[in-house]
Design a protein with these regions (language model features):
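N-terminal intrinsically disordered, cationic/polar leader segments
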Residues: 1-120, 127-173
């Protein structure tokens, strides 16, 4: 799960980059949607995924491009299928400008991309899913807000995870 991945990020390494960047541009660079005839009516069980993140650094231009990829698989509840009834995926390119790159390592950029890159792209992913479900003619899905929790916060770990994405969609276990 995405929250588990975030717990392995060295936030201190990400902060060093975060203090020096400004988000300059966000673009969708790759997307796909698939709708089966069975997928037009909910409610749905939904699985959200975040794939690997590509990080590109241009030292001359002092830019950092973070490319997070997200996907969603939706299964009509009680349809008993192994494959999703509809799928949505997108890769975003987040371009950041940097004040300077002094003393920044590849580990700093990786940590930043996996923490801030996902966090900054998440609202665009939410809007993309909302828009695509409307265009596909299925009940719109509202992706939950992205919450960062401290990696060693025992109190936060005790809180129950929200299982509902919205009234017409459930998060698949």
């Amino acid at each position: 799960e995405l929250q588990d991945k975030l717990k392995t990020i060295d936030i201190e390494k990400a902060v060093v980059v975060a203090e020096r960047v400004a988000l300059h541009n966000v673009r969708v660079v790759k997307s796909s949607c698939l709708l089966k005839p069975s997928g037009t009516k909910g409610p749905y069980e939904v699985t959200l995924n975040q794939q690997e993140i590509d990080i590109q650094i241009n030292k001359e231009k002092k830019t950092l491009v973070v490319l997070p990829s997200f996907s969603l698989n939706a299964f009509v509840i009680d349809n008993k299928k192994d494959s999703p009834d509809f799928e949505i995926s997108a890769t975003f390119a987040l371009t950041y400008t940097l004040e300077d790159l002094d003393d920044l390592s590849a580990e700093n950029f990786q940590a930043f991309g996996h923490a801030n890159g996902i966090y900054n792209a998440w609202p665009y992913w939410r809007e993309f899913v909302q828009s695509m479900t409307a265009r596909m003619g299925v009940p719109p899905l509202t992706i939950p807000v992205f919450r960062l929790s401290p990696p060693n916060n025992k109190e936060a770990e005790k809180l129950p995870a929200k299982k509902r994405v919205n009234k017409s969609a459930k998060k698949k276990k």
